[in-house]
């Protein structure tokens, strides 16, 4: 789907993936297959065949129930077991992946080498290795668009659809794609520096940044953060069925476009900016959605205070 269309591309991609999972489960599905027994079989397929986490399974069931409610309302479906189907799926809180300020500055200031350059890197365990730069132009675009999100709180979808007309001097006014909220966001010096890099090349269709799909952005963002040695080990805990799984990865492997907005929120709160003001920039309407970020910053504050004990 092209930019500028009203349907959220991210939502479209999620439902496309959901449709694929249904076809993999049973290419000849009928509504009658979604009895309680069939629903349990679908959950087992997602867990055992596709190796999904419980949190992901819950999202897939949410998509399925939405579709079955629609089909029931339209008279296509008469099997209503889904209305009462609520499997116990043990979950943990999702870890907030974001860049600390020093890490963000490392990415922001990174001078991407030319294609084919062999970059010497050091892993968190001290191991040295080389990585070849694959697409310098895409990495530079990724750096700038991602950092713009980190400095403005924009979701990637809103940064990708940002138009020159949205920029008004020291601020920008946008209507968000996901929630249709109209927000006025002041531009700090870092965001302005990024805009200056693109002013001479603003496209004829009015978009501020050159287009990269979310999928490509995520791919190049991991490579960019690896080149910047954003490799602190991060452990994630999740459940697959009743099995608890603990996985540790270097942070760059966990980076995605979602981390841009999270980076803005966490750093703003750690700078001492009140949650009320941050919410005016992000468009959050209640503290519940801000709580994971506040919890992260409270932990960071406690760790920072312990530095006094080490003096």
Per-segment meaning from a language model:
Residues 54, 58, 77-156, 215:
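Basic, Lys/Arg- and aromatic-enriched nucleic-acid-binding interface segment
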Residues 1-18, 74:
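Short, aromatic/basic-rich helix-turn unit that serves as a nucleic-acid recognition element
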Residues 128-136, 202-203, 207, 222-280:
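Short, basic (Lys/Arg/His-rich) helix/loop patches that form interaction surfaces
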Residues 9-13, 25-44:
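A Lys/Arg-rich helix-loop hairpin that forms a DNA/phosphate-binding surface
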Residues 176-180, 214-217, 282-307:
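Catalytic-site neighborhood detector that most strongly recognizes the C-terminal catalytic loop/helix
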Residues 165-171, 254, 271-292:
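Short, polar N-cap/turn motifs at the start of nucleic acid-interacting alpha helices
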Residues 107-110, 186-193, 197-198, 292-311:
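DNA/chromatin major-groove-contacting recognition/catalytic segments
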Residues 152, 161-197:
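Conserved tyrosine-mediated DNA breakage-rejoining catalytic core shared by Y-recombinases
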């Amino acid at each position: 789907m092209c930019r500028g269309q009203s349907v959220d591309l991210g939502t479209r991609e999620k439902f496309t993936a959901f449709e694929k999972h249904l076809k993999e489960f049973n290419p000849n599905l009928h509504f009658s297959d979604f009895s309680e027994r069939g629903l349990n079989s679908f959950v087992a397929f997602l867990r055992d065949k596709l190796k999904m986490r419980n949190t992901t399974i819950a999202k897939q069931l949410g998509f399925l129930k939405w579709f079955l409610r629609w089909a029931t309302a339209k008279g296509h479906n008469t099997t209503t077991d889904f209305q009462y189907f609520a499997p116990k799926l043990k979950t943990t809180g999702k870890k907030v992946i974001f860049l600390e300020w020093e890490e963000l500055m490392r990415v922001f200031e990174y001078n991407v080498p030319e294609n084919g350059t062999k970059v010497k890197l050091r892993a968190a365990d001290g191991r040295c290795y080389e990585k070849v730069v694959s697409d310098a132009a895409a990495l530079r675009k990724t750096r700038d668009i991602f950092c713009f999100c980190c400095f403005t709180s924009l979701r990637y979808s809103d940064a990708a659809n940002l138009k020159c007309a949205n920029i008004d001097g020291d601020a920008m006014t946008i209507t968000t794609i996901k929630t249709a909220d109209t927000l006025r966001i002041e531009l700090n010096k870092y965001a302005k520096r990024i805009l200056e890099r693109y002013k001479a090349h603003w496209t004829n269709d009015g978009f501020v940044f050159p287009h990269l799909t979310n999928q490509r952005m995520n791919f190049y963002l991991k490579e960019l953060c690896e080149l910047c040695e954003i490799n602190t080990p991060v452990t994630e805990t999740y459940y697959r069925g009743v099995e608890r799984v603990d996985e540790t990865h270097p942070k760059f492997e966990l980076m995605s476009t979602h981390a841009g907005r999270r980076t803005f929120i966490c750093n703003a709160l750690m700078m001492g900016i009140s949650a009320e003001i941050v919410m005016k920039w992000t468009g959050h309407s209640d503290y519940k959605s801000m709580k994971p970020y506040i919890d992260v910053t409270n932990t960071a504050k406690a760790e920072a205070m312990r530095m006094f004990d080490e003096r």
